[in-house]
Structures are given as C-alpha cells and as structure tokens.
C-alpha cells in the first residue's frame, strides 16, 4: 500500500509552488 511519504509531500509542494509562482 502507498504510504504518505514526506518526499512525496515535498515534491507536490514544489510543484504547487512552481505552478502558483509565489514571489
């Protein structure tokens, strides 16, 4: 089963930040 891994969270956060393009 897939567990909620910190690495996955960080990767998703990076993508979200890149998409939203926060200053």
Curated annotation (Swiss-Prot):
Keyword DNA damage belongs to the record: no
GO molecular function, one term: retinal binding
Keywords recorded for this protein, A-Z: Extracellular matrix, Secreted, Transport, Vitamin A
Localization, UniProt: Secreted, Extracellular space, Extracellular matrix, Interphotoreceptor matrix
One annotated Gene Ontology cellular component of this protein: interphotoreceptor matrix
Function: IRBP shuttles 11-cis and all trans retinoids between the retinol isomerase in the pigment epithelium and the visual pigments in the photoreceptor cells of the retina.
Listed name of the protein: Retinol-binding protein 3
UniProt source species: Oryctolagus cuniculus (Rabbit)
Biological classification of the source: Eukaryota, Metazoa, Chordata, Craniata, Vertebrata
């Amino acid at each position: 089963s897939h567990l909620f891994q910190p690495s996955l969270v960080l990767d998703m956060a990076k993508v979200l930040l890149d998409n939203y393009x926060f200053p």
